[in-house]
């Protein structure tokens, strides 16, 4: 497969994993008036990129992709357990698990999934997003760095889609916000690539609190 097509396929919002159903706490941040306009939205997303994703989520995703790319199944299992244990709230755990399950079902139905990866997937009883993403990257011969870039882009695109549904934020304003955030997206990838997964960690208290509050939110559009 053409490498550019494979990358676009992985990053596409049409990938049937249900990412549009989740806001990762952003809906509650809007509900609590923490995010009220493009400026506060940019601060929220920028903080998530540099203080949470770049320090923990992205290095862990990259470790999944690197292990899957070379078929180091023991290492992949280890970082997978680390990822699973790091979900701070019920809905964040359910989000990752549901999207991982959808990716598992997708990959199992593809003829290009190689035998070793298929065997690993069949033995996986509790898939999650990072694991499925890494195996999709292996299947479509996407490098770990490109897979990380696709994951970061998908995350940003999803956050902007949430904003357009919860704020008075139009498509042109969302594109201006994208332009402002792209340098931070690049910085997040650079920082994540330099981070070892063993001491990696983050203390995103605001995200955890928003997620916990969202679990009890009376009226909501998103599952997280």
UniProtKB/Swiss-Prot annotation:
Compartment annotation: Cytoplasm
Primary location: cytoplasm
An annotated GO cellular component: cytoplasm
Family the entry assigns: Belongs to the UreF family.
HAMAP family hit by this protein: UreF (MF_01385)
InterPro entries for the chain: UreF, UreF_sf
Gene Ontology terms, MF aspect: nickel cation binding
Record note on quaternary structure: UreD, UreF and UreG form a complex that acts as a GTP-hydrolysis-dependent molecular chaperone, activating the urease apoprotein by helping to assemble the nickel containing metallocenter of UreC. The UreE protein probably delivers the nickel.
Annotated keywords: Chaperone, Cytoplasm, Nickel insertion
Keyword Cell membrane attributed: no
A Pfam family reported for this protein in Swiss-Prot or TrEMBL: UreF
Gene: ureF2
The keyword Flavoprotein belongs to this UniProt entry's keyword annotation: no
Functional description taken from the UniProt entry: Required for maturation of urease via the functional incorporation of the urease nickel metallocenter.
Protein name in UniProt: Urease accessory protein UreF 2
Coiled-coil ranges (or none): none
